[in-house]
Amino acid sequence: MKTTKRISINLLKSFVGASLAFCVSSGASAVGIEDIVDGGNNFAWERVEIPGTKCSDGSQYKFWVHDNPGSRNLLVMYEGGGACWDYETCSGAAGLLGAANPNGLPDDYITQQKAQYVSPLVNGADPGFPLRPKTDIATKDWDVAYMPYCTGDVHVGNNITTYNDPAGISPPINFHHMGYNNSIAALDFLNNKFKRINKFLITGFSAGGVASGALYHEAHERLGIKRGKGYMLNDSGPLFPAADASANSRQLHETISIAWDMNSVLTNLPDSFNPDDMGSVTDMLADEYPNDHFAYTGYSTDLNFSRFSYERFYPGIDTAGILALWQEDQQLLISKMNNYDNFSYIIPWNRPINDSHCSTILTFLGSHACPSVRKKYWYEALEWPQTQSWKCPGAFTSMTNFLSSWIGGNTLRLEEPYNLYNQEDPGMQIIGPQINSAL
């Protein structure tokens, strides 16, 4: 396998963070995601190719637009898929800690399983399962722009560079971190296409979640969004506060800043953004757009984005150590969001799908939150299901209801404590392994 083609079997699992690639195994017992969820869409997609936009290998960047004539609401979805910043991560030598689509985007990408099934937000419905019907959600019938990910730079890099094999064995890799250029060109296209936008939602998962916050200012200004009509939902792509060298995420931020030439991009943000602390994007958004609506979702035990954040920078760190740093950083983010009336969040503890990474992908099953969840008391042990030792004394807030209320203009703040509710849930025990086996 030639390094210059930059194909890695491990990188196939980099689609969401580092482990969401839809694939069907060979053999009679093969199961694909389409066999498990009643999802997907049949949109009449328009493929858009803008001259000068490129994937990491220099091939043409492409994105897709669904224009519903009856809608004035626009959703822009930034796809996830890991990240890379050196030879090991950009070549695939680092295994799962790499970036998606290193060989560009085929013309039928939008109809392939991963793009078609990945997002209930795009499809406008939480997909059903056997005995569980499909449920329409707040983004049903919206116009959609789907931004695939193929630049390894969370859609905001601005650097063409060469990565050399430190062992001197394999040939160098020429890598186009051109996410920012691609994103700006796409936003300008959308501005020309959609002239009368009512509500505007920019969102993304994993690497795309980072992009949703980092690009909100550019999107808002270029598309001329009315104040109070803008929404940003970051799914599992947090920019944690990292103001000094002691911060847990500081090494990651410094590394990508150099590799992707972030200084050339960050200068375009308002003065309320502190370029020495990427986590200040939370303050910038809240201050610059006090009437708009922002939200974060992610799991407290995410073992995907957390690995990208710490594993390469803390040699020898184990799973417990990774999650400890993640939860420390998450509390810093929560404290920062609590300072602003226009920031919401829904943070469940765990979901045994995709290493608890991403709340809004594939299905909303298990993405609910109950801040008062606890162990059952002894006298509740016989409550159904008897195999479930955890209980929500009130009611779970589902992702569907969270989105409906938040897009309706309300602020919601939900953080679950430690619990194993999802692990013991009978439905999750059936569906979770099936989904994971199809990833």
Located regions from the model:
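Cleavable N-terminal signal peptides
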Residues: 17-18, 28
